From Swiss-Prot:
UniProt keyword terms in alphabetical order: Cytoplasm, Isopeptide bond, Nucleus, Phosphoprotein, Transport, Ubl conjugation
GO cellular component: BAT3 complex; cytosol; membrane; nucleoplasm
SMART domains to which the protein is assigned, alphabetical: UBQ
Subunit relationships: Component of the BAG6/BAT3 complex, at least composed of BAG6, UBL4A and GET4/TRC35. Interacts with BAG6; the interaction is direct and required for UBL4A protein stability. Interacts with USP13; may be indirect via BAG6.
Region (Required and sufficient for interaction with BAG6) residue spans: 96-138
Superkingdom of origin organism: Eukaryota
A molecular-function term among this protein's GO annotations: protein-folding chaperone binding
Residue ranges the record marks as coiled coil: none
Function: As part of a cytosolic protein quality control complex, the BAG6/BAT3 complex, maintains misfolded and hydrophobic patches-containing proteins in a soluble state and participates in their proper delivery to the endoplasmic reticulum or alternatively can promote their sorting to the proteasome where they undergo degradation. The BAG6/BAT3 complex is involved in the post-translational delivery of tail-anchored/type II transmembrane proteins to the endoplasmic reticulum membrane.
Ubiquitin-like domain ranges (all copies): 1-76
Protein name per Swiss-Prot or TrEMBL: Ubiquitin-like protein 4A
Covalent cross-link Glycyl lysine isopeptide (Lys-Gly) (interchain with G-Cter in ubiquitin), where: K48
UniProt subcellular location: Cytoplasm, Cytosol; Nucleus
Length: 157
């Protein structure tokens, strides 16, 4: 069936999908067509937000239906995600918010989101590769900087 997805900023696209398609799959198609990251999308049908895990047929969305797309600001998305899973895996959310604001000044919303996601993946990968020896070495440098300086000069106190 043919659907039209219209963003509040005026852009729109037509998509060919199955009636039993998942909303999450539709979001990926919208991302490809309108260049809006999936995590920033909120799709509405007749004023009701669509849940990713549900199917279009669950909302009685039929051929030639029109869906509205609300693009969530990147900062809001990061706050939502931060409260969910970043507390354990990543540093405190404020640093990612700050980085997000800096990126937003230099890139489009979509590009800033991609750069931030890649930066977070690289950061997580680097942290996961740290050994206990690496962590002990870092801790010693922070807790006893005078010893580290002496060792770098070639002698200990």
């Amino acid at each position: 069936m043919q659907l039209t997805v219209k963003a509040l900023q005026g852009r729109e696209c037509s998509l060919q999908v199955a009636e039993d398609e998942l909303v999450s799959t539709l979001k990926h198609l919208v991302s490809d067509k309108l260049n809006v990251p999936v995590r920033q999308q909120r799709l509405l049908f007749k004023g009701k937000a669509l849940a990713d895990e549900k199917r279009l047929s669950d909302y009685n969305i039929g051929p030639n239906s029109k869906l509205n797309l609300v693009v969530k600001p990147l900062e809001k998305v990061l706050l939502e995600e931060g409260s969910a899973h970043r507390l354990v895996d990543s540093p405190a959310t404020p640093i990612w918010q700050l980085i997000s604001k800096v990126l937003a000044r230099h890139f489009s919303v979509a590009d800033a989101s991609r750069v931030l996601e890649q930066l977070q993946r690289d950061y997580d990968r680097s942290l996961s590769r740290l050994t206990l020896d690496d962590i002990e070495r870092l801790a010693s440098r922070f807790l006893h900087p005078e010893v580290t300086e002496a060792m770098e000069k070639g002698f200990c106190k």
